Amino acid sequence: MSMPLSNALQSQIITDAHFLHHPIVDSEFTRKLKYARMDSENIYLPPLTRGNNHNYDGKSVVEIRKLDISKEPWPFNYVTGACRESDGITTTGRMLYRNLKITSALDEIYGGICKKAHATTELAEGLRLNLFMKSPFDPVEDYTVHEITLGPGCNVPGYAGTTIGYISTLPASQAKRWTNEQPRIDIYIDQIMTVTGVANSSGFALAALLNANIELGNDPIIGIEAYPGTAEIHAKMGYKVIPGDENAPLKRMTLQPSSLPELFELKNGEWNYIGK
């Protein structure tokens, strides 16, 4: 008689299966894109090694995986398409100079409605604008794209491995509006998008991002730029507007987890989000 799988083991299997080959998406992108056969099975990098490169938040609620995005557009199209196909999401839309039109199928998670397709499409088009429509005189920056998924510690049967958002980062030295005159930053977040309906998803994602960059030490500082109307949202996560930007339409903000013990804790070398 076969033994029933534990929730933890079942979650791990689901998590692993989420990152396997996507034959439906493969076929579609191979048909549409001339070079879509190149290394398509390697678009997803393996999870970072546990230890110094641990890529979960401290409770394994959220996991971050770095995506292998090249300088050509088709791998990014492939990745976002694979994520939508895997999650049962249908998305159409495009963004031209911030004119974003999206239609999407919605699904339920944590008893709420998640607009995963919105996050996927907005990030895809924003990065495409940044990566592939630049002037030859303006070199492409070294973007790192992180896919945020629910980890085996999410305690929601069947949802481990589900994509809930994306973070794209740049080396702090490439944050164009940050100079030596501004407060120090170690990580610059160019874009962060997480779905609605997953409690504290942004907090868990930030903890996982810190753990994926644990070489920055015990006192890292994250920098971000807040568009009009979003500074208040970032402030709830502990971000503070830098001096001089209080009345600016585009506010530069910093997050120093070590100064926010009510939101973040560093335990056994790992960051954990403990906000309510």
UniProtKB/Swiss-Prot annotation:
Q: Which organism is it from?
A: Escherichia coli (strain K12)
Name by which UniProt lists this protein:
Uncharacterized protein YjiC
* Similarity comment: To E.coli YjfZ.
